[in-house]
Amino acid sequence: SRIVQSAVAKGSTLYNGKKYKEAAQKFELVYALSKKDTSFLENAALASFYAKNYDQSITLYKKLLSIGYTGITTQYKATNALSGEDMYFNSQKDMDNQVRLKLAAAPEVLVSESRTGNIAKNIALSYIAKGDQDAALKAIDDAKKIFPNDYTLIISEANIYFKLGDNKKFLELLKKAIELKPNDAQ
């Protein structure tokens, strides 16, 4: 619908202009008007985080997890037989027809990775930003079940333990982070 398209355009413009609070509201509106557009709920959560509205960010990220959102997308890509440029199709059937007619070649089905781990990590980072160490540690623990060797999660967890004065746990996690990325000075 026109209203949805207008809200998407306005939200994107606001986001690109670093007006995150307003962008989050527009992206939430898109989701409210079109529940199938769940990626806009993720956009709203991220914009809320950047707007330092951490409670809203946490609420939206948790909602994404509760509705089973993964963020996995599938793209159908082939090379235009005449121009050699990449072409994207709405469906496998459309792509296959173009290949069969020899209008396209080298078909590929591209499937993105799940966003679930990033969502769990962003919940933890929102709690850290709020200063809620206990909730952050629980969220990190949940996220590590999905991504046990995520460098950012390990560093975030180490920093919390440092703030809590648990130097033993801090050093243990730092050692693990160094093993994962020996050349990272973070």
Predicted regions and their residues:
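Helix-start (N-cap) detector for alpha-helical repeat units in TPR-like alpha-solenoids
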Residues: 4, 37-39, 72, 116-117, ...
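Canonical positions in the second alpha-helix
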Residues: 30, 64, 143, 176-177
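Post-signal peptide N-terminal segment of secreted/secretory-pathway proteins
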Residues: 1-31
